């Protein structure tokens, strides 16, 4: 995905779980073969040398405020809105990497953007439900507030981040998906890395099942 960052935008890991009744699996085998999201997060750090496990990873549902912002910024009469991942906080985790198409250098987004505070700011913006020009200005101010230029990749400025944010969230134009790809526009491409949590008897959570966003027959 890194070598082909101009064509790849998402990598999703599927952890190992033991379906059904697992009373016949001894503790030694379970400990050896179970691979959880925690293992994945630390392996990305240990094997790729990027991301900080406690800083750069967040629940997939944490992207909800940005879906709401996209819906606010596009035409209210649009046939389709943004995809909103309203799953349980324990459903999965994700992180955002910026990959340079030429050098293949990787930088976590949260290295130079306070995403937690930015999400809170975006929630205030969407709750205000003001006209698009005002919401756009508020979003720009929120990015200015949370951008850390001294930690950003060389040559990557606030204006580029703002343009790329609108593009990646589908918020430019009058409808989601109006612009199919921005692969040729930016030197740094967004690579979203995520992992799903498949439950087993060892960690089953009924509330998480109730909030699952993947339909099962």
Enumerate the language-model features and the residues they cover.
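Radical SAM enzyme core and accessory elements
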Residues: 75-217
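Conserved C-terminal portion of the radical SAM core fold
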Residues: 1-67, 88-92
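Charged, glycine/proline-rich intrinsically disordered loops and linkers
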Residues: 63-78
């Amino acid at each position: 995905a890194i070598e082909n960052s101009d064509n790849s935008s998402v990598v999703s890991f599927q952890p190992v779980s033991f379906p059904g009744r697992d009373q016949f699996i001894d503790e030694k085998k379970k400990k050896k073969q179970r691979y959880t999201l925690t293992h994945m997060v630390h392996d990305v750090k240990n094997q790729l040398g990027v991301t900080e496990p406690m800083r750069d990873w967040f629940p997939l549902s944490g992207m909800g405020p940005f879906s709401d912002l996209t819906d606010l910024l596009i035409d209210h009469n649009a046939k389709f809105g943004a995809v909103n991942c309203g799953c349980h906080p324990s459903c999965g985790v994700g992180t955002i990497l910026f990959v340079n198409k030429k050098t293949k250098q990787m930088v976590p987004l949260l290295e130079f953007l306070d995403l937690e505070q930015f999400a809170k700011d975006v929630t205030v913006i969407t709750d205000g439900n003001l006209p698009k020009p005002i919401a756009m200005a508020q979003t720009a101010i929120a990015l200015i507030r949370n951008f850390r230029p001294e930690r950003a990749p060389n040559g990557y400025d606030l204006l580029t981040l703002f343009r790329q944010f609108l593009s990646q969230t589908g918020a430019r134009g009058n409808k989601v998906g109006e612009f199919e790809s921005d692969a040729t526009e930016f030197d740094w491409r967004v690579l979203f890395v995520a992992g799903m949590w498949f439950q087993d008897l060892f960690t089953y959570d009924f509330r998480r099942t109730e909030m699952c966003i993947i339909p099962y027959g």
